């Protein structure tokens, strides 16, 4: 039977290609050279989705996430303070670079902490591996020696896809100078045992013992496949840049065999753009959107939904414009289908339910969460001036176990209105009356008639009843309905248009409506 989701497909592929195992290892990782952006998150959640699919099929899974923080600090991000100071750390391991924002930890660790803090919010809890600690504790000493002993084979594997071939005096390691801490070094000799001789641009020369030094590491194209073997990695995806023909993944597939291992099952995931900005996201400029930023507007469930509902090899945009409303509507539909409140054709139902299931940070609720449209929340949050308790009181029949998720959604609506909603979507009920427009007598009469109707019928009148009455009153007073609508909006929110008027009046209530309109009539 066809699998319900792409994550289930890859879970089956892993088990088929790697055979029965007591424990499957899935892996992800990043160099924390800047803010870990939402494009990087695509890899993490892709691995998490496959890990869940494996677990759901009855397998045990180890999910490792490597902080490649022993990589070199190559460029100072533009958003960091004390640029001059940071420039002095170029070519050192990023774990040595200070965090000039907090001055409490290293630059790398600050970026790691920020990301680690928000992963559990979306239900992701990997085992983090600090690669600087691995190298400085000599965990990879035997792997480094193995690489040096197999220099010729590694050189041939790398040269297969290189236009300019590696020189004869190339070594499969890089060295941080123990005097200046930079990698501006040249390896001069390896004695075929444990001693490496190097010289640095700073003038330092010395010999290092592979077994005890903190200063030697493998270059990334060798380090990555070495760790596949070391950690027994069964699955690791990579971006389309790594999966290009002759790219790093092709090279690594050959190199892992030299280390007497096998390449993991993989797939290529595509780039993410931010709606309205376009292009590939990069950490180096510092101008990026992080998981934290996305969670300001999207609940954890909807954040996961963005990725679970999209095939990994598909490029997509994360929207902060009006598309946010549509994305929430789509998620709510999947939720109704999952809980059987809404029906869909059988062939779609299984896929929709699986996407919803994988969108949950943890287990789905036993009953359907409280459903209220994001557009509606955006309106009522402004009417009640972002007062959570007033919003909850307005929304009827909210159960105690539904409150947490609902409050989260309300906060996302509040944040979206404040930071991203178009100006014509924003409003506030009029509280000052110093720029009042003088109404014609027939308009005053029409407003009074509408007020009388509402006073008599507010509790029983539907939105459609109010809408019909507005049209009726406008015509009876020789006012174009479009003009009458504009006048009412202008009175209520000092704008010529706003939320659907009849529903808007129902939400603000007769008392507030009368208080504002009475100033004009």
Curated annotation (Swiss-Prot):
CDD domains: LysRS_core_class_I. One of its GO terms (biological process) is lysyl-tRNA aminoacylation. SUPFAM superfamilies: An anticodon-binding domain of class I aminoacyl-tRNA synthetases (SSF48163), Nucleotidylyl transferase (SSF52374). It holds the Pfam family tRNA-synt_1f. Disulfide bonds: none annotated. Coiled coil: none annotated. Gene3D superfamilies: 1.10.10.350, 1.10.10.770, HUPs, Lysine tRNA ligase, stem contact fold domain. Signal peptide: none annotated. GO terms for cellular component: cytosol. GO terms for molecular function: ATP binding; lysine-tRNA ligase activity; tRNA binding. PANTHER family: LYSINE--TRNA LIGASE (PTHR37940:SF1). PROSITE patterns: AA_TRNA_LIGASE_I. HAMAP family: Lys_tRNA_synth_class1 (MF_00177). A motif ('HIGH' region) lies at residues 32-40. It is found in: Cytoplasm. It catalyses: tRNA(Lys) + L-lysine + ATP = L-lysyl-tRNA(Lys) + AMP + diphosphate. The keyword RNA-binding does not apply. Keywords: Aminoacyl-tRNA synthetase, ATP-binding, Cytoplasm, Ligase, Nucleotide-binding, Protein biosynthesis. This is Lysine--tRNA ligase. Able to charge E.coli tRNA(Lys) in vitro. Belongs to the class-I aminoacyl-tRNA synthetase family. Its EC number is 6.1.1.6.
